[in-house]
Amino acid sequence: MHVSCSKCGIEDILEFSKNPDEVFLEFLTRYDKGLVTEKGLSEGLTDEGIIRSEKEIKEMIGKNNPEKFIEKILFSKKDFISEYKILKNSEPKMGSKVNELGLEKEISDFLNELKIKQFYKFQEDAIQEIVFGENVVIEAPTASGKTEAFLIPVIQRIKKESNQGKVFAIFVYPTKALARDQYPKIKKFADKIKINVKVFDGDTKIEERREIIEKSPEILITNFDVLHYHLWHQTKFSSILSSTKILVVDEAHVYSGIFGTNVHYIIKRLKRICKNKLQFVAASATLDDAKTFCEQLFGEKMQLIKGSGKKGETDFVMLFPSLRTQRKLMVELTKKLTDKNHKTMVFSNSHLNAELLAMQAKKQKINIKVHRAGLMANYRMSVEKQFKEDKLQAISCTPTLELGIDVGNVDCVISSTIPVNRLTQRIGRAARKGQRGYAFLTLGNDPISQYYKNHPDDYFEDIEKTYIDPNNPFVEEFQILAMACDKPISKHELKEHQDVIEHHIIEENIIESNNRIIPNFEKINSVLNNYSIRGIGKSIDIFLNEKKVGDRTLPIALEELHKDAIYFLAGSRYKVKELNYPEKNFAKIERIPKDYPYYTKSLTEEWPTIETVFEKRNAGGIEVAFCKLHIEKKVYGYVNIELGQEVTQGEKVMLDTPLEYDFITKGIVFHAPKPLEIMEKSEDEEYTEASGYHATEHVVIEGSNMITGGVSQDLGGISLGTSGLIFIYDGAIGGSGASKALYDRFEKALERSMHIVKECPCKNEAGCPRCTFSYRCGNNNEFLHKY
């Protein structure tokens, strides 16, 4: 822990402690003994591996010529520079001339108007394969011309094959905002060729809906939520989908986990109601094993077409905040960049961190606003508009802006720790116009960041694993019901789902009639209406002065919106004065003084029950099982944490009525070896043993981060006292696939966990935030033992 005097500048490095008073007293004691000096600390920090030597940094820079402000960051002696490099995109291979591909004259003429004379090779390949009717995955960087690669052949096919007034192609985007953002670009092209394009989503007005149904567009832009809803309700809109020949899915990497599993079934349902055999096109900037993933998502064989993009050079710096928090580092970087008039996007991995960062940045006079899910759509659009019009210097955002929404010119991206392919997506937001860009990966004060500090090359190898789980029993049950609503199921259909169909017949959710299976609407209507394909369950609506200002999904809402919790919303803090759960699912918040010094962190308890063991194996001498689990969760209290200091103040506060939630999911369970040698040296063997298992649970979850696709935040963990049993489970109801990825790579997770503990320099018995602590810990990181 770095300690310094704000007046005289003397500084020292001390062992980590949660109690700031203990740190201060230790600092004074060392000062009195003459152990704290004004000179020589940097040399000691280099020897300890806390910062890099100037020689090492110069070797990193090599023949590159970074700008002065980048040099100052590299040589600041405040952080450990794990990596510095110039990112250069390879020049894209050029393909055929526009007039050599046999495109319709109107298409060629319009491309010439746009000054496009020649295609990139990947565009040419995609155009030809799509025109020939092949299923295609287009993998190419952000802003490289992917949209043109699928739009041009679709328009070519429409001109050759379409009957006007029927849907020929559906373009699906993961969010309404992105669909609306892409619409003008697609419409501009289609209008020129006299092809009708329309958007149909939750914001489409009644008159527009009527027009779309009466005179269907050749290209329909929508999302999977809309397709799901209208298919099972058999609306007039669903009836116009049957003529579809091509389904285009942009940003395909988004459809991972529960959401992707639901999308897999919606695509299956769309196939059932379409008169033609559907052709599939997927596009993405970042997908691990894109071909295999898309074949699972679509249930069809796919061809992979890869491309590169032309873009300016980007200075990339990976920093580890040795002497301060990650947030302070990110705020300082934002300040340095915005002071140079560089428009900056700052990505955090959680709502809370995005809000806290914006709050601290505003104190540094940075013109910044928050953009995240859970804020009202009109507020988010306002932030996008202000940034695009240069009225904002910076945006503090979550992955909501990872996708291709146009926010105008961006010079710099600062990101917290995420898998490298998602970082590439974020970096792709900067320097799109060929100017020099700047990208900073700020490692955190957490175990996996400690690992990457010492092993930066591994970071670039840890590609995010994208996965779906078609065998998720809850998704399968809901989607088979929806399928029966879309169109009666024939007796010889869906043999692979026969067990689920028979279960629904027994439960009278569906009825056998004339060799067909039809839905029992009276019984299942409310069940399907309450189902979310995004796997996020129900939400708690948030009200301020009787006006809805946001929402938060369950179960995380119970941890953030319990009575007296401090809740962050759009850069401000509020206190929860009432939570109505589970009857009506709303929370009322009230304003608090700006100088209120605390925020809250909930305290939780969890109990697991093994329902079914799917499979088990031996991994490095440890038996690990992959299971169906029943998790019971209780929020029973909270602690106050001081802003800026990030340490607990005061006593734990117990809730009058604990909040309870339970769900079925998937996970792993293993029996950790008994730490006999450590226990023999301990005065309290039982405490040491239980605390060691608790620390193991934390470190394995953090060690699995990136190995499972950077989704440790989607995993929960439970260690059962001195039993040695450790459970790690999917936070999503029914399971997301993350714990299965951990099960498959368990040996690697254990190996990485060992590195994290051994390489952390702390001597604290309980460990520290960089080895054994977890910010998600429901016990406030108590009862931990590192050794």
Task: Describe the role of every protein-language-model region.
Residues 246, 253-308:
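Post-DEXD/H (motif II) to motif III coupling segment of the RecA-like Helicase ATP-binding lobe
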Residues 2-4, 11-121, 135:
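Helicase-associated low-complexity/disordered flanking segments
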Residues 365-367, 373-381, 388-394, 398-447:
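Conserved RecA-like helicase motor core of SF1/SF2 enzymes
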Residues 168-182, 334-361:
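Conserved strand-helix element at the start of the C-terminal RecA-like helicase core
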Residues 419, 436-439, 445-462, 477-493, ...:
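Extended Lys/Arg-rich polyanion-binding regions
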